[in-house]
Each structure stands twice: as C-alpha cells, then as structure tokens.
C-alpha cells in the first residue's frame, strides 16, 4: 500500500513537472492580446558593445513600454553590424526573456532626402545585398526585411536592361529574381530553418511601379509584415488617412490568407500632436494584428522629453489618450528623470487598449475588390473608412459577399464586367464608383446599364434624397453650410436608372447615387468627387443615405460626421473612433429588434432610440431607404481623438 502511494505521488509530481516544463514561456511584455517588438537599427550594435550602455537603455525602455521581442538589424545603407558582438547582445536579451530576431534594410542610402535603393544591375550592389543576407542568416533563425526592398534606380545599366518593357514590368521581373537569387536562396543555403519576413510599406497603391509584388513575391517569403504608419494626414508628403492603419493590415491579411501576415509596424515621425501616435497603435490592433513593431529603439530609449503638440482644443476633455495620466504613470529607473517620451506614450496606450481587444471577434467590413498590380482612385478606401464605412479590401473577387464595392482599380481585371454580371445574376448587389464606370464605359459595362461619364464636372452644394413623383427631401445640414463639391457628370436614361441621391445646381440635377435593377440584383453607381477628400465635405445626410444602400444588411452602420470611423466584428462587437478635434454625436444602427448595447470599458448599458424598421412611411424620405432588417438605434457621444468599444446582445 505504501509503495503504491509513493508511486502515485511520484506520478503526480512528475505529471506536474511535465505540464510546467512543456508550457510555453511567458512573454516579457505580459500583454494578453498581442506581442510588442522594438526594431533596433544597425548603429545600436556599436552602442550595445558596451554592456553598461546596453543595460541602462534596456532598463529605460522596459520601464516605458513592456516588450516581448527585438528585431536586431545587421545591415542598413552600406553599414554592417559587428558580427563579433551579435551573439553577446542576443544572449543579453534572451537571458531577460526577450525574443531576438534579425533585421535587414537592403538599401543603399539616398540623396537629397530621397530614398535610395540598390542598383541591381551593378555587380557590386548585388554582392553587397547577398553578403548582408548571409550575415543575417548566420546569426538568426528569423529575419525581417525593412520596407526599402524596392527599386528606384534608373542608371544607364537599368535603362539598357529595361529595353522596351515599362518600368513597372522591368522592376517587377527584376525584383522577383532578386528575391529568390539574392535573398531566399542564399539565406536558406546557410540556414535551412530560417524564416524570412518581408515588410511592405504603406504606399500599396503604387507597389508594382517600384517592384514590390503582392501577387507572387509575397507568397514566396515565409511571412509578410504591414507598414501601418500613417503619421499626420495633412502635412506629410503622402497625406495618408488615419483609417489606413486598420485597412492596410486587413488587406494584407487577405493577400496572405494563410495567416502569413505577422503584424503591423509604426514609427514616431511627422506627428503634430501626441494623440496621433497612439491612434496608429490602436488602429493596427483593432485590425487584429498579432504583433506590433515600434520603430525604433532610439526614440523608445531617448532621454529627451517630448512635447504634447498642438492639442489645446481637446486637452481638457476625457479623451482615450490622457497626457497627464501617461506622464504620471511612468516610474523611471533609479537616477533618471520622469520626463515622458515616445516609449511611455506607446506603453501607456498599449496597456489601455489591451483591456478591450479580447472582447472583439474577427473584423468584418464591406468587401471591396482590388486586383493585384492595380491603381485607380488611389487610397479611396481609406477616405471611405474615414466617413464611417468599414472596408474589407481583398485581392480576390468576393463572390460570397451580398454586395461588392468596386473602385477604379478593378479595371485591371479583364473579366470584371463578367464577374459583375454573374454576381448580379445570383441575386447579389454591386456598387461601382464613377471612376470605374468611366474606365469601363467602352469595355462592356453598358450591357448592365447605359450610363456614362460625360467628361464634364459640376460644382454642387445642394443635395436631395429620395425619388419618385414629387418625392424627395434636402440632405443638407441646416446647422452647417457645407462647401461646394466638384463632381463628374454622369448621364443616364430616366426610368432605366434612378438617382436615389442627387445633387442640384441651379435648375439641373446630377446623380450622386444611381440605382438599377439587373437580373436578380441591384447595380449602383456612386459618384466620387473630383478630389476624393471632398467625401469629407459631403453633408452627413448624403453619406448616411449612401451607407443605407451599401450596408443594407450589415450588422452595424453609423450616421456620423466625417473623420469618425467604425470597426465591426463578427461577434456583434464594434468600435467607434473619432479622429476629429471636436466632440461629435453619432447614431449607430444595429441589426435586430431591441438589441442591448453595452460600453465594454465602462459597463454602461445604452438607452435605445425608438426602434426603426426600414422603410416606414413616416420616414422623412418616401422611397430613399432600401428594404432591410429591423434595426435598433442608439445615439453616442464621442470625445475628440478617442475610441469607444461596444458589445451587443439580443
């Protein structure tokens, strides 16, 4: 009996030992819903050779932002890391529970502020690229390529090699060869188990012109990474809109539908106010990035304080980023000041958003098709996102979607008209932009509806919703005098198509949203302003009418001013985020009768407005609203530069 008891006791402790020893190690950052990585550029190797410097910087960064991983760079702009110090530095981090992976910036530096890439027609540049890859492969099992792996050179050798090909075709073909011959094969020859991750930048509309290739190249690498840095939307040269930090990660998830998109990456550049940095962090994580990389180690470790920037308009409001709370939360290492810096801005903001991410399911949105290697109405989806339309961008035609949104870039699919017809014939709907209509009007789209862009433009400031004999009402905001918007003129046949939203200039009407029944589906044409950013200047009534048709059966839709985004998830949760400098009030419409809505952060249960089942004769329009399910409406006050998280239950 005693022997049996001892055997059972031994078996119990041995089982416990196995369970503990086989459990995955705890990550240093301690976040529940994501990992945090910090990218160390190549010059860190020189500083980190002094272990006292390394220890001091490590303590400082970890006190500001808890992190799980570092990407340690071995090459950038003609500079190599000291190989002799790499293993020692790696051990320092791994001994403290931090994962260490490699980094490469395969670029040659630039001139006059422009980015410079290798000239891959030069043997010495090809050799240097290969050498850098081989060094990384010797020291790391995972290596990420920073987003300078493109091709700008137009040397005499490049011009001769290009021949009669376009620059786009030449660069795509060249970079496909470079990817295999100078990166993947050399790395795997040295380290067969290596994983090479390619980070793609934020200018996805123009990739093909510089040799980036989401169609083939992105599939060859072991994973991809997403540049979600959007910075300031008004003063930078790119003018990227805030919504892109979410949208581009979702798009790249669909490019690598096998789960190969490893995360999002932001930096601290070109910011006019401190809130803009956490907004990029939050939006990357609202897109469900499994990892977020902070570029770079230096601003995380710097001793210099940062300025909150131009945020006087909202600094006393209850915003999601609270400058004072962030400053007071920092406990510096002994002997250092408590001055705030970007590291603590990141750390505080990540800690806050980690509280709610677990309540969000898988992101969903209105599906929009952008073929590989396509351009047209560039970055339009981010402007649509910023007027409150959740977008799910995909490189494959989404035949399963109830409605497909097609912008001008869809013209790069030679079979797009046939796909549209098939979709409509199956009882589903298609909405095309005026840019795509113009591109296809001599390529078969008139088989669906004989509408065309005339080439003329008109300035519109008055808008009407509703249609039918004597029906319609102003969509202008009586409290705000909206500016005039320049739009293309679309010609159509009366009674073949109906303008469910129209603009009026003097005594003439111009369609903003056209509707046509084709087979079993509905075909829409959405007129896009000549300046896409004028979507922000459309009256709120116009954008809400567009949403009613585009999101007819969508779980949640939002009546809102511009610069307020909506992120929706398949478990009924959603996020409302304002990028505005002022307070805003929105109305969210949730599918279902008497749905309960709860603020996921405060626990507050919101009071519903009178439930609206669409359409109703007492609505202010007669037939402007499409048939749809019963919905429950709620009014929500949103502070400036803030997000609110909600969960629903029937």
Regions found by a protein language model. Give the residues of each.
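Bacterial N-terminal signal peptides
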Residues: 8-22
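Compositionally biased, intrinsically disordered/low-complexity regions enriched for serine, proline
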Residues: 19-22, 189, 485, 508
């Amino acid at each position: 009996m005693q022997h049996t008891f001892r055997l059972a006791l031994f078996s119990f402790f041995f089982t416990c030992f196995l369970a503990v020893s086989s459990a995955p190690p705890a990550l240093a950052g301690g976040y529940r819903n994501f990992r945090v990585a910090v990218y160390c550029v190549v010059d860190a190797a020189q500083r980190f050779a002094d272990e006292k410097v390394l220890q001091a910087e490590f303590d400082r960064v970890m006190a500001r932002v808890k992190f799980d991983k570092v990407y340690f760079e071995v090459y950038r702009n003609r500079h190599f890391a000291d190989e002799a110090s790499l293993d020692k530095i790696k051990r320092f981090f791994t001994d403290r529970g931090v994962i260490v992976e490699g980094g490469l910036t395969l670029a040659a530096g630039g001139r006059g502020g422009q980015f410079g890439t290798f000239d891959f027609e030069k043997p010495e540049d090809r050799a240097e690229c290969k050498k850098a890859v081989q060094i990384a492969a010797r020291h790391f099992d995972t290596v990420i390529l920073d987003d300078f792996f493109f091709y700008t050179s137009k040397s005499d050798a490049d011009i001769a090699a290009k021949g009669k090909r376009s620059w786009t075709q030449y660069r795509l073909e060249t970079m496909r060869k470079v990817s295999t011959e100078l990166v993947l094969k050399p790395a795997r020859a040295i380290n067969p188990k290596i994983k090479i991750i390619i980070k793609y930048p934020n200018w996805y509309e123009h990739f093909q012109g510089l040799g980036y290739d989401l169609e083939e190249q992105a599939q060859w690498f072991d994973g991809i990474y997403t540049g979600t840095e959007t910075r300031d939307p008004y003063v930078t040269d790119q003018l990227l809109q805030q919504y892109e930090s979410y949208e581009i990660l979702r798009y790249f998830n669909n490019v690598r539908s096998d789960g190969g998109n490893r995360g999002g990456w932001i930096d601290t550049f070109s910011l006019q106010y401190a809130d803009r940095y956490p907004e990029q962090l939050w939006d990357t994580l609202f897109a469900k990035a499994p990892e977020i990389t902070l570029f770079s180690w230096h601003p995380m470790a710097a001793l210099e304080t940062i300025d909150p920037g131009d945020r006087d308009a909202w600094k006393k409001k209850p915003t999601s980023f609270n400058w004072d709370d962030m400053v007071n939360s920092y406990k510096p290492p002994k002997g250092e000041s408590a001055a705030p810096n970007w590291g603590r801005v990141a750390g505080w903001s990540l800690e806050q958003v980690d509280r709610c991410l677990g309540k969000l399911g898988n992101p969903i949105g209105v599906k929009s098709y952008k073929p590989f290697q396509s351009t047209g109405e560039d970055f339009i989806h981010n402007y649509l996102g910023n007027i409150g339309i959740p977008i799910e961008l995909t490189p494959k035609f989404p035949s399963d979607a109830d409605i497909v949104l097609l912008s001008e870039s869809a013209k790069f699919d030679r079979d797009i008209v046939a796909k549209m017809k098939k979709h409509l014939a199956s009882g589903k709907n298609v909405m095309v932009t005026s840019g795509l209509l113009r591109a296809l009007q001599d390529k078969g789209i008139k088989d669906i509806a004989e509408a065309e862009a005339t080439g003329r433009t008109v300035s519109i400031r008055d808008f009407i919703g509703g249609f039918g004999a004597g029906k319609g009402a102003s969509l202008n905001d009586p409290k705000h005098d909206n500016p005039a918007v320049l739009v293309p003129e679309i010609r159509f046949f009366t009674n073949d198509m109906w303008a469910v939203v129209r603009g009026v200039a003097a005594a003439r009407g111009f369609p903003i949203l056209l509707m046509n029944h084709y087979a079993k589906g509905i075909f829409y044409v959405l007129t896009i302003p000549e300046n896409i950013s004028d979507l922000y200047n459309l009256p709120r009534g116009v954008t809400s009418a567009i949403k009613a048709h585009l999101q007819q059966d969508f779980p949640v839709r939002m009546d809102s001013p511009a610069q307020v985004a909506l992120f929706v998830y398949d478990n009924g949760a959603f996020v409302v985020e304002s990028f505005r400098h002022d307070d805003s009030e929105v109305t969210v419409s949730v599918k279902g009768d008497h749905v309960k809505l709860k603020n996921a952060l405060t626990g507050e249960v919101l009071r519903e407005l009178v439930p609206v089942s669409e359409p109703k004769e007492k609505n202010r329009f007669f037939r402007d609203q499409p048939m749809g399910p019963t919905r429950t409406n709620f009014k929500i006050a949103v502070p400036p530069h803030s997000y609110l998280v909600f969960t629903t239950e029937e």
